A protein has these predicted regions:
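Pre-active-site segment of Zn-dependent metallo-hydrolases
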Residues: 20-59, 71-75, 148-155
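Cap/insert and terminal regions of metallo-dependent hydrolase folds
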Residues: 87, 148-199
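Catalytic core of the metallo-beta-lactamase
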Residues: 8-18, 110-161, 176-181
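A short helix->loop->beta-strand "cap" motif at the edges of active sites that frequently abuts
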Residues: 20, 78-81, 97, 189-193
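Active-site HxH/HxHxD metal-binding segment of metal-dependent hydrolases
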Residues: 44-109
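Short active-site oxyanion
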Residues: 2-4, 76-82, 138-140
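Active-site environment of divalent metal-dependent phosphoester hydrolases
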Residues: 31, 63-68, 89-92, 107-110, ...
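Active-site neighborhood of phospho(di)ester-bond hydrolases with catalytic His/Asp-centered motifs
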Residues: 24-25, 54-68, 83-86, 141-146, ...
């Protein structure tokens, strides 16, 4: 069965695999700002997007606003199960989600035919998550900053979602390593398909 994907821009995806609909890192409403204020970085949506219906799972890679965007999360049904990094779990707990599973790198979530393994991701400043998602029919790897967990063993992955450019800021250094990591992902996963994400 084919994987269906809708890209919302930035880090946001709606994926459907084996009839399971997973919303990842959505930014659908309002401006995107980072502490200490919008004078540093401010993102604006050209148009607000309605939250998709029939979501089976909300998957959050990081607690930063471009991954766990509070105005967007406020408009999503709080009874939807959430899988999240440690920092993202704090965000959704504060907003009122009731079914939160926190995964640290190396930990796994299992539910019927769905298996989600957290991998070590970017350090912004704490270690955040990438994920390997498996069902009986499909497999996906996603890590939004291009940080590859060196403990992952070679295996076949159907779909890899990754940035494909490197990006640096004077204060933060290189915090997106897509161009650097892409050859490693190709060798490690031999993916059928690659989707490029942006931040």
């Amino acid at each position: 069965m084919a994987i269906k994907a809708i890209y919302y821009g930035a880090n946001g995806w709606l994926l459907e695999l084996d009839k399971i609909r997973i919303l990842i890192d959505p930014w659908l409403k309002g401006d995107l700002t980072f502490p200490p204020g919008d004078w540093l970085i401010k993102g604006e949506l050209a148009k607000e997007i309605d939250a998709p219906s029939d979501i089976d799972l909300l998957l959050l890679t990081q607690g930063q606003p471009d991954h766990s965007h509070p105005p967007t999360l406020e408009k999503i049904d709080k009874s939807i199960p959430v899988i999240a990094s440690q920092s993202a779990s704090k965000v959704v707990n504060k907003i009122g989600f009731t079914k939160i599973t926190t995964l640290k790198p190396g930990e796994t979530y299992n539910n019927q035919n769905l298996n989600i393994q957290a991998t070590s991701g970017a350090s912004v400043p704490n270690i955040e998550n990438g994920y390997i998602i498996d069902t009986n029919l499909n497999s996906i790897y996603i890590e939004p900053h291009g940080f590859l967990d060196k403990t992952i063993k070679p295996r076949k992955i159907d779909l890899v979602i990754t940035p494909v450019i490197d990006f640096s800021l004077p204060i933060a250094g290189k915090f997106i390593k897509g161009k650097t990591v892409l050859p490693q992902l190709l060798k490690l996963f031999n993916p059928t398909t690659i989707f490029a994400s942006t931040t």
